[in-house]
Amino acid sequence: MPYNAPPQLAEMSLFDIAKALEERRLPPIEKCNPEEEIDSRMRIAAGGTWFHDGTPINRPAMVRAFSSLLLREESGRHVLLTPQCRQPIAVEDAAFMAVDMLEKDGALAFRLNTDELVLAGPDNPLRAEGDAETPAIYLAVRHGCEARINRSTWLQLVEAADFVDGVPSVTSQGATFPLVPQ
């Protein structure tokens, strides 16, 4: 089955983005509770590259498939989850990278390195880590996993920021998020 990448984020309306989010089909991993655990021998590097046995996974379709099975446990450990087994996966920073952003109609939409779209808001908050000089911004994606905002997307985010009580912040879907650690 051929993969049809979504259109460029800048070409999409908020309605188009909402429709794409509604139509996305992800495996129901929240229903899985396997007892068996095996080592995935996989890791996600800080830059978003996926590796298996030390070799980069160069097929975007494979990365998209694996990422749909990803969950972060309460302990902070990331696992690939199927009905048959749980497979720990080493994540150096965040499971995803946010590589583009669109501000439209009071919402911030992000495209991830997997081509997935995420709307920041109460269900997918942004959080700032690090310090005021070198903040790291993260976006909640799903199942406890996050996306780190890459540098070019961070610059887009800064352009969209306003000062709220003296703190650079952005608002999306009625929720306001500071861009510096609090």
Which residues are covered by each model-predicted region?
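Long, non-globular segments of proteins
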Residues: M1-Q182
